[in-house]
Amino acid sequence: MYRKHIISIPDFSREELELVVDTAARLKQSPRGDLLQDKLVASCFFEPSTRTRLSFETAVQRLGGNIIGFADGGNTSAKKGETLADSIKIISSYTDAVVMRHPKEGAARLASEFSAVPVINGGDGSNQHPTQTLLDLFSIRETQGRLDGLTVAFAGDLKYGRTVHSLAQALSLFGARFYFVSPEVLAMPDYICEELDEKGISYTVADSLEAVIPEVDVLYMTRVQRERFDEAEFRKIQGQYALRADMLKHARPGMKVLHPLPRVDEIAVDVDATPHAYYFEQAKNGVYARQALLSLVLNETV
């Protein structure tokens, strides 16, 4: 993976995904403060972020590296009309890697074509969020003890939620079975379903969250975005795809609830105290997964 661009999950082999997860587990168990010594990473966030940006910056510094960058594209020369290609040419001439989030789909792939150093996609529009998927895989294996043959439900906004697109693609390499629970207007995109069909991966489209909970090893919740509905329709959908603690009474003992965060109303606060809640530990795992990725991309051996 040395000097590899990290743009989308389909660019990874199963073996590479396992390598990142294994390395993350090792770094969580035995921290290393020297893996990015003398390395400089650019953190280029053209779109707001809390967890992704801060966990990347934490990862770089804990590995002994240095970081430069910006948290808002409005404060850069992009506001003056500079193209992304020109910006990346310049930024990559200063640094050893570029971590980038951008609101436009395909922006990370474009950046990689003009960068002199590896580009790591921190999210491009509603398209891909590969490093979120890596921390999700790490959290899933940490809680389930394996990645192979799991049953996973995705619930909420499956159309615009880039995290579920990437994670479905990744877990398909491990023979997962899926439940897709969403309103019809926010269903999993056809291209993801077609990819799963081609691989012979089983999935079921469902409209009842409570009905699928007893069947799954992992429940992956996402936020239904208020701005996509009128108020009456949103209130109806919101209640239908919100998780409460009482809905977990028939869940498998080891089942874990994940969420890319931020949550709004789709997971009630009373779920936090249940043994199934794992979304805060999942967010914490973002540092270890991103440490692993940076170490593998910027070192020939780790």
Curated annotation (Swiss-Prot):
Pfam families: OTCace (PF00185), OTCace_N (PF02729). GO terms for cellular component: cytosol. It catalyses: carbamoyl phosphate + L-aspartate = N-carbamoyl-L-aspartate + phosphate + H(+). Disulfide bonds: none annotated. Pathway: Pyrimidine metabolism; UMP biosynthesis via de novo pathway; (S)-dihydroorotate from bicarbonate: step 2/3. L-aspartate binds at residues 80, 162, 223. InterPro entries: Asp/Orn_carbamoyltranf_P-bd (IPR006132), Asp/Orn_carbamoylTrfase (IPR006130), Asp/Orn_carbamoylTrfase_sf (IPR036901), Asp_carbamoyltransf (IPR002082), Asp_carbamoyltransf_Asp/Orn-bd (IPR006131). GO terms for biological process: 'de novo' pyrimidine nucleobase biosynthetic process; 'de novo' UMP biosynthetic process; amino acid metabolic process. Its EC number is 2.1.3.2. Carbamoyl phosphate binds at residues 51-52, 101, 129, 132, 261-262. Keywords: Pyrimidine biosynthesis, Transferase. GO terms for molecular function: amino acid binding; aspartate carbamoyltransferase activity. Heterododecamer (2C3:3R2) of six catalytic PyrB chains organized as two trimers (C3), and six regulatory PyrI chains organized as three dimers (R2). Catalyzes the condensation of carbamoyl phosphate and aspartate to form carbamoyl aspartate and inorganic phosphate, the committed step in the de novo pyrimidine nucleotide biosynthesis pathway. Belongs to the aspartate/ornithine carbamoyltransferase superfamily. ATCase family. This is Aspartate carbamoyltransferase catalytic subunit. It comes from Chromobacterium violaceum (strain ATCC 12472 / DSM 30191 / JCM 1249 / CCUG 213 / NBRC 12614 / NCIMB 9131 / NCTC 9757 / MK).
